Amino acid sequence: LPGMWAYRAWQNGSQFVHFSTDAVFDGSSADLYSEDDATGAPSVYGQTKRAGEEAVLSANPDALVLRTNFFGWSNDRARGILDFFANGLESGVLMTGFRDYVVSSVYVGHLFELLIEALSAEGSGIYHLVSSSPLSKYDFGVALAHAMGADADLIEPGLLADNLALSDRGHHLGLSVDKLEALVGHPIP
């Protein structure tokens, strides 16, 4: 479907934006992934997102494909990583944060500001729209605790590798924002 939608946009002369994910990478590199690095998603989710990227760019070479990993509040404050940690910190519940799962999550408000900038700069092709500072899920939770004035000791360090239910995820999915910074003309926070 994404390829079909991208083609229709191209026929109409409309800009097409496709959101993808950091999960297109296998997560085995300690370095930040660039847009040109080989993908190799271990999960069906990442594989299908990569197939969507390819279909979109094949159908519409002017399309903007944004690989992202974002956080924000869900409508019911019960679905995302921000909700998980904030609710636990407010309730005084012990939680586990994975030290070996590193991502470049961007706040959803910043994501949309950067989307507008990328569109205004007439970007096309693949860009990484994420934070410039990768964090482990543990470090994310601790940073949130400090921002909330909550007890960071409620977050215990754990390992994704010990959680068999999540074993198909790459462990280091930090993405480079160099290409996006060049497009928008300023550093990405």
Where are these regions (language model features)?
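NAD(P)-dependent short-chain dehydrogenase/reductase
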Residues: 54-103, 108-110
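NAD(P)-cofactor binding segment of oxidoreductase domains
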Residues: 1-17
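C-terminal amphipathic/interface module of NAD(P)-dependent oxidoreductases
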Residues: 153, 168-189
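Glycine-rich Rossmann NAD(P)(H)-binding loop
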Residues: 74, 96-102, 127-135, 183
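Catalytic helix-loop patch of NAD(P)-dependent Rossmann-fold dehydrogenases
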Residues: 15, 24-66, 70-72
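Mid/C-terminal beta-alpha module of Rossmann-like enzyme folds, strongest
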Residues: 114, 121-172
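Helix C-cap/helix->beta junction micro-motif
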Residues: 8-12, 59, 148
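Conserved internal alpha-helix within the Rossmann fold of NAD(P)-dependent oxidoreductases
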Residues: 2-5, 53, 115
